[in-house]
């Protein structure tokens, strides 16, 4: 096992994670692209109405093929990635007839933008959540009440809230990263009192994350989510989708998933929670490919050396172990709540009609159950 150089790690982390926002972008997501890309902004704004009228595919087929080389890295790239990937999901997943390919006027720029973003050319958590909000009061907090989405499929309050409540979870969890990293820094300097304080602070933040997660129920109804939001977030079918003008070989990519959030995997890695089961571990590893590369690097760096677990094994302090156990307990509660939420929004809806996609929902429930059991097992060991 590689030994983690905490000093070098902290220097790298400073460029990957915001000390307050965590994995949310800073500055706020861009509100419009340069004029040369107005066609994308216009389709972005018209998408809900076009989907309602079953006109989206025709509209997309008729937009010009734009050269993405003029898109700058940073906010412009993030906005383009969100727009183009959500266009692709809408094109493939909603229409009277299934399609086998994405037209080249979308496929070519999407492929290039995705390559520059370091992510697959499909809508993922980083686009539909992390880069899909603006503040109503620019000086106000990043909380659901002060946010509006930048892009929707059908639109409506339920879809808005699904994205914005998740932004709220990411926002609350942003400070968790600085507490975790201050804990690691204190271990390096053998300051046990700061380690304990940092872990207790982290446990408090995890509790707030759990409260933020529960807010999903406030304005996102399960039947609306299942029938009007979830279909657009699906991955590509088993026979794949061709990106015209890029490659004639059909590609298969996963759809958007909360497992693509870097927040929970970072907490797992920092606290030493592992997922050895073949029902959880491989899926979590795959989901890292859908994260912004700098975010997944944080997880990989933390996994190099479980210094917190080693410190716990050497230090017999009851205060230290209690503080650590609070963190694990909080994550166990999070996974329990997330499992209950998935059952409510997916499994229960599948049972109500013939439109359910039983296997997809069942597999995700199995993953969540296994991940929760692995967290619970570590809690019982401590």
Q: At which residue positions do the language-model features occur?
A:
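Surface-exposed peri-terminal alpha-helical interaction modules
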Residues: 1-382
């Amino acid at each position: 096992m590689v030994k983690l150089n905490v000093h070098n790690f902290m220097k790298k982390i400073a460029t990957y994670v915001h000390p307050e926002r965590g994995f949310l972008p800073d500055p706020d997501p861009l509100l419009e692209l340069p004029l040369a890309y107005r066609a994308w902004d216009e389709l972005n704004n018209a998408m809900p109405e076009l989907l309602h009228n079953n006109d989206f595919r025709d509209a997309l087929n008729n937009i010009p093929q734009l050269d993405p080389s003029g898109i700058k890295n940073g906010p412009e790239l993030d906005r383009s990635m969100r727009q183009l990937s959500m266009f692709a999901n809408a094109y493939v997943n909603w229409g009277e007839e299934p399609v086998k390919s994405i037209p080249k006027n979308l496929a070519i720029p999407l492929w290039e933008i995705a390559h520059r973003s370091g992510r697959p050319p499909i809508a993922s958590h980083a686009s539909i959540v992390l880069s899909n909000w603006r503040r109503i009061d620019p000086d106000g907090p990043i909380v659901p009440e002060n946010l509006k989405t930048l892009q929707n499929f059908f639109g409506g309050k339920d879809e808005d809230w699904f994205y914005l409540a998740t932004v709220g979870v990411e926002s609350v969890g942003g400070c968790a990263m600085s507490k975790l990293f201050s804990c690691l820094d204190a271990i390096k300097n053998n300051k046990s009192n700061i380690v304990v304080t940092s872990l207790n602070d982290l446990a408090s933040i995890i509790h707030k994350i759990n409260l933020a997660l529960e807010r999903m129920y406030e304005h996102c109804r399960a039947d609306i989510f299942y029938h009007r939001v979830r279909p657009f977030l699906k991955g590509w079918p088993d026979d794949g989708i061709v990106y015209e003008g890029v490659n004639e070989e059909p590609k298969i990519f996963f759809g958007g998933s909360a497992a693509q959030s870097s927040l929970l995997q970072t907490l797992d890695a920092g606290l030493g929670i592992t997922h050895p089961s073949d029902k959880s571990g491989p899926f979590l590893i795959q989901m890292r490919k859908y994260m912004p590369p700098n975010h997944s690097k944080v997880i990989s760096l933390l996994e190099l050396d479980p210094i917190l677990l080693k410190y716990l094994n050497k230090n017999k302090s009851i205060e230290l172990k209690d503080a650590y156990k609070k963190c694990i307990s909080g994550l166990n509660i999070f996974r329990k709540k997330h499992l209950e939420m998935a059952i409510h929004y997916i499994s229960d809806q599948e049972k109500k009609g013939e439109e359910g996609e039983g296997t997809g929902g069942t597999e995700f429930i199995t993953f969540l159950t296994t991940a929760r059991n692995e967290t619970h097992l570590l809690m019982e060991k401590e």
